[in-house]
Amino acid sequence: MADVRTHAHQVQVHPLRQHEGGIKVVYPQSGPSSTQVLAVVAGVPVGGTLLTLAGLTLAVSVIGLILAFPLFLIFSPVIVPAAFVIGLAMTGFMASGAIGLTGLSSMSWVLNHIRRVRERIPDELDEAKQRLADMAEYAGQRTKDAGQTIEDKAHDVRESKTYDVRDRDTKGHTASGGDRDTKTTREVRVATT
């Protein structure tokens, strides 16, 4: 038969919360504060005055345009080319200003670039000086080592010549006498030093 098992069920209990959002947050239950009341009292007359002035300005502009239209119509052969010339002049001035601003920003960029390069050059110069000093020290050490090697070889050659002279004199010493050998060795030593 079918195996019947009972599974434990989990139950989550959430307490009921009251929603505190929406319009209650914007308008608290206590009513407007005194600063809000003062802002409305001061803002309504100022806003009304500005709105009235805007309406008057629009009305005067429309009336002026209606009155000036016949004059525009009569003088249009002169006004249209004049407006065209003024438009071209304004375009030229704006283009000139834009080109001048571009030139000024380009010059600023070049000067900043030169300033950065000049700040970097002393560091590179110091590095180059340090490398030259290291190379000079290395060359000096190599020269000193080469000089020491040459001096050692010269000393070895002197020693070998001294021994050769002794060997020759020793052969001659047996033939002629012992006094001559010491003189020759001394003379060779003095001559080499």
Swiss-Prot record:
It comes from the Eukaryota. Residues 40-113 are annotated as: Hydrophobic. It comes from Brassica napus (Rape). Keywords: Acetylation, Lipid droplet, Membrane, Transmembrane, Transmembrane helix. InterPro entries: Oleosin. It holds the Pfam family Oleosin. GO terms for biological process: post-embryonic development; reproductive structure development. It is a multi-pass membrane protein. The lineage of its organism: Eukaryota, Viridiplantae, Streptophyta, Embryophyta, Tracheophyta. Belongs to the oleosin family. Residues 139-193 are annotated as: Disordered. Residues 2-39 are annotated as: Polar. The modification N-acetylalanine is found at A2. Residues 142-193 have a biased composition (Basic and acidic residues). The chain crosses the membrane at residues 37-57, 66-86, 87-107. This is Oleosin S1-2. It is found in: Lipid droplet; Membrane. GO terms for cellular component: membrane; monolayer-surrounded lipid storage body.
